[in-house]
């Protein structure tokens, strides 16, 4: 071996096009589409995929993890509490005990999304970045999939028609915006859906309401993470993430139960 690298331009292009075509053909009809690759979305993806559920995660940005990367006000740590710490430990994430706080741990705000994303991918979930969900497929009073567009095309303001992905269930894990639910409410006012938005910060109340607010809010459409609190007017929490991970896990468990009973 002389160490010379092959770099034929056309071969590179052909390889990308063939691989991309095969990938899209495989994911245009799935069990679950998760909108938003933040902490709750990645957690839901991991638990769904490791149970054999065909899962696609769509993220508008070119990286997954949502707001985790920035830690608290840019300081590179987040806080997680019991029992949510077990979710991170399963993904091989190192946790440090907090002096004087028996149930609180800190974690590296870069390590957490990196390893949680890899855990979801290794479980079998497909994560696509640079894709925005601009609408939902609504058939016979049930959500049946998502309408997707390139985020670059959307940002450029170009009028180009979108494509679609069919799904048995859709999860809105878009965070504070609850963008999928907002879109459903705005475009289908006859459904009577309202999104009051989240309240101001009350960390303990917000954390404890997250799993309670995680549910199917319309046939085929679930909310988890901060989208759940935004839909139910729950409190925000700041840089403590345990409720987010527990919300994602609960959402996955609810859908798994639905799929098993079908």
UniProtKB/Swiss-Prot annotation:
Q: What is the gene called?
A: thi4
Q: Which pathway features in its UniProt record?
A: Cofactor biosynthesis; thiamine diphosphate biosynthesis
Q: Which organism is it from?
A: Methanococcus maripaludis (strain C7 / ATCC BAA-1331)
Recorded hits in NCBIfam families, A to Z, give: sulfide-dependent adenosine diphosphate thiazole synthase
Reaction catalyzed: hydrogen sulfide + glycine + NAD(+) = ADP-5-ethyl-4-methylthiazole-2-carboxylate + nicotinamide + 3 H2O + H(+)
Summarizing the function annotation, the protein's role is: Involved in the biosynthesis of the thiazole moiety of thiamine. Catalyzes the conversion of NAD and glycine to adenosine diphosphate 5-(2-hydroxyethyl)-4-methylthiazole-2-carboxylate (ADT), an adenylated thiazole intermediate, using free sulfide as a source of sulfur.
The entry describes its oligomerization and partners as:
Homooctamer; tetramer of dimers.
Q: Where does glycine bind?
A: 236
Question: Which residues bind NAD(+) per the record?
Answer: 40, 59-60, 67, 133, 159-161, 179, 226
Q: Which cofactor does this sequence's record say it needs?
A: Fe(2+)
What does the record give as EC number? 2.4.2.59
For this protein, the record's InterPro entries field holds: FAD/NAD-bd_sf, Thi4_fam, Thi4_prok
- What is an example of a GO molecular function annotated in this UniProt entry? pentosyltransferase activity
Positions the record marks as coiled coil are: none
Annotated GO biological process: thiamine biosynthetic process; thiamine diphosphate biosynthetic process; thiazole biosynthetic process
Family label? Belongs to the THI4 family.
Stated name of the protein: Thiamine thiazole synthase
- What's the top EC group for this one? transferase
Name the keywords, alphabetized. Iron, Metal-binding, NAD, Thiamine biosynthesis, Transferase
